[in-house]
């Protein structure tokens, strides 16, 4: 399976402990293509549906409904970075190809990790 950075897949995240995101849900691949091509693991960020009135934090990025193959308004949870075996990935929803949205995600990741970086 060829996995590309910025692609959104469905992934099985269970088993989990405590507040970790679980179940089968969309995830955003953030690891570099050169690494994805040679390793059996990928770095991902879980995505969750946005509930009405839910606040968006600086380490999160909103994705409007009906974008990138997702039917609901969603949130990329940069505080929940995970490493997964590629076999956990199934359905490809789409790809975040908009540079502005990629930059928002990089900025949220840097905020989460305490990295001073201008995307």
Annotate each PLM feature.
Residues 1-2, 20:
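Short secondary-structure boundary segments
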Residues 19-24, 29-65:
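Compact nucleic-acid interaction/catalytic patches
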Residues 17, 36, 40-43, 88, ...:
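Low-complexity, compositionally biased segments
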Residues 1, 66-119:
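C-terminal terminal-subdomain/extension
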